[in-house]
């Protein structure tokens, strides 16, 4: 499995590492999930856990018109995956959910 977690509490340079990963993996997927998920599959996890394509402007600073930061430094962490199956499996493992919501970009 090839997943990569980008979390400012775990990596000092998570924001630049995330941007580099997005550039290097244009056909990949990103799980957007809360940093402090306990993996219990609760309503908060269901509400905030989503899978996006790397090309989605809501999770990709390269796709926005203005320079935006804070993709990995706020409440959320990003998990990069090379395939949709890997993204789904990691999202379920991290959140404890049985099903994961997809952004319309997927």
What feature does the model see in each segment?
Residues 2-106:
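Mature, structured domains enriched in cysteine- and short glycine motifs
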């Amino acid at each position: 499995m090839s997943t990569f977690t980008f979390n400012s509490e775990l990596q000092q340079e998570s924001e630049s590492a995330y941007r580099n990963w997005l550039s290097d993996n244009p056909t990949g997927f990103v799980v957007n999930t809360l940093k402090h998920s306990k993996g219990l599959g609760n309503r908060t996890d269901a509400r905030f856990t989503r899978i996006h394509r790397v090309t989605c402007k809501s999770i990709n600073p390269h796709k926005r018109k203005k320079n935006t930061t804070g993709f990995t430094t706020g409440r959320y962490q990003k998990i990069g995956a090379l395939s949709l199956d890997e993204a789904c499996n990691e999202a379920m493992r991290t959140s404890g959910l049985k099903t994961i919501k997809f952004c319309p970009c997927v």
